[in-house]
Amino acid sequence: FTDHGRAREPEIARWVRARHRIEPSTALYHAHSEPYHLATPDGVAVHNGAVVLAEIKTTGHAWRSIPRSYLRQVWWQQYVLGADRTLVVWEQHDDFIPTNAEPEVRWVERDDNEIHVLVGLANRLLGLMRR
């Protein structure tokens, strides 16, 4: 499954660039105030002065909504890069063959309450590691 996602991600990223003007990214970013808070969004752009991100997924199952674990990843990336919105893009496949002509997309808005929880958990973990 991971190999399929790695193979499809550049293709989907090109689609995201063409449709949504978000550039593909493989860069590793750190939060302004905490160099150990890291994120690797799949796409980064500045639209009208605001940072926007993209996160690309492939799945063998239909989604009624974005899985919570992916939402946490998105909120974390928004925190690290100071973004307010992320375009979550996913391609469903059946036996590794895409089921639709185009990927599905949903915008996820920044949620500072969720980000606060995630930052607290990360800081606790880093504190334990520094002991």
Residue ranges and their predicted role:
Residues 2, 15, 19-130:
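Nucleic-acid nuclease catalytic cores
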